Amino acid sequence: MLLQSQTMGVSHSFTPKGITIPQREKPGHMYQNEDYLQNGLPTETTVLGTVQILCCLLISSLGAILVFAPYPSHFNPAISTTLMSGYPFLGALCFGITGSLSIISGKQSTKPFDLSSLTSNAVSSVTAGAGLFLLADSMVALRTASQHCGSEMDYLSSLPYSEYYYPIYEIKDCLLTSVSLTGVLVVMLIFTVLELLLAAYSSVFWWKQLYSNNPGSSFSSTQSQDHIQQVKKSSSRSWI
């Protein structure tokens, strides 16, 4: 009578004489996870990391524009909230580090790298949420400051020789500055929302990668290899 036992893709046939002959099965469903780790995982993490690094570069560049661009003093309260918080630079640096870790973790999928990616993405989610609040507050303050241009123009236009005290080009410059600053904040807001979504998705992704995707599979694979070696040794002894 022929008895069969299967262990991790290897079957062992026991003949009537007690000789064990290991037989390897054809690759099946058990190798799909390994194929994903080798092909799908690096591609997905590289895309996520690259977009996060792009968000880092754009947000930091726009922050530098806000620092060095000249604008009227009554716009300072609207912009200083975001700049003094350090979000355009520290937050962008956090996004860049997170993206770099995601790319590295995809190419070298080990538990320490996966845990680092999970932690950094969680921190990036909180940072992006705080940045979203700061940018929204700055946009509201900027809208209030922009109304100052129109109200001051109406007041000075009622005075005699108003063109002498407040030339028309200064009014246009005030409005143009308001539009430019609003555009910069809107673009920063868009990429902050994008980073928030990416960081939240990546946090869930790395959480599943760590705890939901066959935990302890590497340990089981090691046990399987040790068992195969023992079976081969017992088989050779039986032949002798």
Curated annotation (Swiss-Prot):
Highest taxon, organism lineage: Eukaryota
Topology feature Extracellular, residues: 69-83, 143-178
Entry's transmembrane regions: 48-68, 84-104, 122-142, 179-199
Region (Disordered), start-end ranges: 218-240
Topological category with respect to the lipid bilayer: Multi-pass membrane protein
GO cellular component term of the entry, any: plasma membrane
One annotated GO biological process: cell surface receptor signaling pathway
Topological domains, Cytoplasmic: 1-47, 105-121, 200-240
Compartment(s) of residence: Membrane
Coiled-coil segments: none
UniProt KW keywords: Membrane, Receptor, Transmembrane, Transmembrane helix
InterPro entries for the chain: CD20-like (IPR007237), MS4A (IPR030417)
Pfam name, any one: CD20
Tissue expr: Ubiquitous expression in normal tissues. Expression is more elevated in adult liver, lung, spleen, and heart than in their fetal counterparts, and is higher in normal tissues than in the cancerous tissue or cell lines. Low levels of expression were detected in the promonocytic stage, whereas high levels of expression were detected in mature monocytes.
Function of the protein: May be involved in signal transduction as a component of a multimeric receptor complex.
PANTHER family: MEMBRANE-SPANNING 4-DOMAINS SUBFAMILY A MEMBER 7, MEMBRANE-SPANNING 4-DOMAINS SUBFAMILY A MS4A -RELATED
Family: Belongs to the MS4A family.
Official protein name in the record: Membrane-spanning 4-domains subfamily A member 7
Organism: Homo sapiens (Human)
Gene name for this UniProt entry: MS4A7
